[in-house]
Design a protein with these regions (language model features):
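Catalytic phosphate/metal-binding cores of nucleic-acid and nucleotide-processing enzymes, i.e., regions
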Residues: 1-125
Length: 125
C-alpha cells in the first residue's frame, strides 16, 4: 500500500475523550457536529476522489495529561469528522473514502494546544 500525504492541518479545537457520556440522545452529537462545522467553516474544500487514511493527533495543552490510547478517537472526533464531511473534505465518512483512522497524542507542543492535527494520506492498494 502506498501512502502520500495530501493534507496536513492543525485545527484549534480540543479533542475530548467522551468520559462524560452521551446517553442515547442523537441530537447531542448533532449539536456538537453543527458547532464544530461553524468553528471549522474556513476549512471548506472539494472532496478527494480517492480513498484516504487519516491520522488524528491530539495536541495537549498546558496541564493536560496523556490518555489511554483507546480514548483518543472515542470522544468528539466523530463529530469533527462529520463536520469536515459537511465542509467537503470527503464525499462521506464511509470506508470507500476513509479506509482507516489512527489516533495519536503529542505532548511536545503544549504552547499550541489544546488542538487537533489532522493528516490525510492518499491510499492505494
Amino acid at each position: 500500500m502506498s501512502n502520500s500525504i495530501v493534507h496536513d492541518v492543525t485545527l484549534q479545537v480540543e479533542l475530548t475523550n467522551g468520559n462524560d457520556g452521551r446517553g442515547n440522545k442523537w441530537f447531542s452529537s448533532a449539536k456538537i457536529r453543527k458547532s464544530m462545522e461553524s468553528l471549522l467553516f474556513g476549512h471548506s474544500r472539494t472532496p478527494w476522489d480517492f480513498p484516504t487514511r487519516v491520522v488524528v493527533t491530539r495536541i495537549l495543552g498546558p496541564g493536560q495529561r496523556l490518555w489511554d490510547s483507546s480514548s483518543i478517537l472515542r470522544g468528539n472526533w466523530k463529530e469533527i469528522e462529520d463536520a469536515l464531511v459537511c465542509l467537503g473534505w470527503w464525499h462521506d465518512d464511509g470506508p470507500k473514502w476513509i479506509e482507516k483512522t489512527e489516533g495519536e497524542q503529542d505532548a511536545s507542543q503544549r504552547d499550541n494546544g489544546p488542538a487537533v492535527r489532522v493528516q490525510v494520506y492518499r491510499t492505494e492498494s
